[in-house]
């Protein structure tokens, strides 16, 4: 009898291992997600783009990859207590140089890890410019927020539906390569799906992104962030399929608290992967203490003011102004000095620095 029980246990163990290797068909359980979250403590940081890169392609292409700036600026982030960065990828940078792209991702992870910083990688994005190309990227347009940022895959997917096959290969290649990398906190599969008036056209890629991630079954959780309460079908799919709840919120403390309270019943860890817009009263002094108290990850938009021009407000160009009187995003100037010492003091105090 003992032999039979042992044999049955052994068979079940093999089946379990095979299932694990073959992928999964559902999100993590709440218990697994919450146990995963405990190991990280309170995640806080920013959406990181080195000040020398106008967009994802300039960050990741071989000719413009800038590890010196990355190292310097992540050192500044660590010095004020940040421990997690959200970083955008782009399939074109992978497509033109697959092995080099993954090598540079690894190099970035090594630099971040040397500063005690973990990483959330983002695959797709429905925001800003609809078209893009490999090679030299445009110079910033004065006073215009994110003048060179590019979507991924953008309009090209609707013009060439067969691109979905390349995107699947891209996702699976990157996820497989880094599936057990402990320097990666989470895979953010798609930034703000349905934005740029794409609406339901983005749903197919949302579903494909989850399928690809589940097929690879990385050791890290996957998520797609909530960002628009009116996109009810997207929100339903994202809440049903994400291991960890991620979301964006750029408004004041009262409305942000309402969002957090509305998501608590789902019983999963939460990370706010975009916040902090000074014009809308989404500030470090107001929002960050609440997020810490609620044990919600706090990832603001922007760190060092640079080529992205995100010190300027959305849709309010100021082409004749080098610097607006009130910065929209970002924390430090290019020399590492703060836009607001009060803000940096708040961040450091909350992070125990």
Describe the residue ranges of each PLM region.
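Sec-dependent N-terminal signal peptides
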Residues: 4-13
């Amino acid at each position: 009898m003992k032999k039979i029980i042992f044999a049955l246990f052994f068979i079940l163990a093999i089946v379990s291992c095979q299932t694990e290797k073959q992928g999964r068909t559902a999100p993590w359980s709440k218990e697994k997600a919450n146990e995963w979250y405990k190991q990280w403590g309170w995640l806080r940081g920013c959406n990181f783009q080195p000040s020398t890169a106008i967009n994802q392609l300039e960050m990741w292409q071989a000719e413009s990859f800038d590890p010196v700036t990355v190292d310097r600026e992540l050192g500044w982030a660590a010095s004020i207590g940040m421990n997690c960065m959200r970083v955008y990828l782009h399939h074109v940078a992978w497509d033109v140089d697959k092995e080099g792209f993954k090598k540079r991702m690894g190099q970035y992870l090594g630099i971040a890890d040397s500063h005690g910083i973990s990483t959330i990688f983002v695959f797709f994005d429905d925001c800003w410019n609809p078209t893009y190309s490999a090679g030299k990227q445009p110079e910033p347009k004065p006073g215009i927020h994110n003048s060179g940022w590019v979507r991924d895959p953008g309009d090209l997917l609707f013009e060439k539906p067969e691109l979905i096959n390349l995107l699947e290969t891209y996702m699976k290649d990157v996820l497989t390569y880094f599936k057990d990398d402990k320097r990666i906190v989470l895979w953010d599969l798609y930034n703000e799906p349905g934005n740029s008036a794409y609406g339901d056209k983005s749903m197919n890629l949302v579903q494909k992104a989850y399928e690809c991630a589940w097929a690879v079954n990385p050791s890290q959780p996957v998520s797609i962030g909530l960002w628009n309460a009116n996109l009810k079908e997207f929100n339903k799919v994202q809440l049903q399929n994400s291991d960890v709840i991620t979301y964006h919120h750029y408004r004041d403390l009262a409305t942000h608290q309402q969002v957090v309270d509305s998501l608590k019943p789902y019983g999963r860890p939460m990370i706010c992967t975009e916040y902090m817009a000074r014009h809308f009263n989404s500030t470090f002094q107001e929002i960050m203490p609440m997020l810490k108290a609620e044990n919600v990850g706090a990832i603001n938009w922007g760190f060092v003011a640079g080529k992205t021009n995100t010190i300027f407000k959305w849709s309010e160009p100021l082409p004749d102004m080098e610097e607006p009187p009130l910065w929209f995003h970002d924390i430090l100037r290019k020399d590492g000095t703060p836009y607001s010492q009060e803000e940096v003091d708040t961040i450091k105090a909350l992070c125990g620095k």
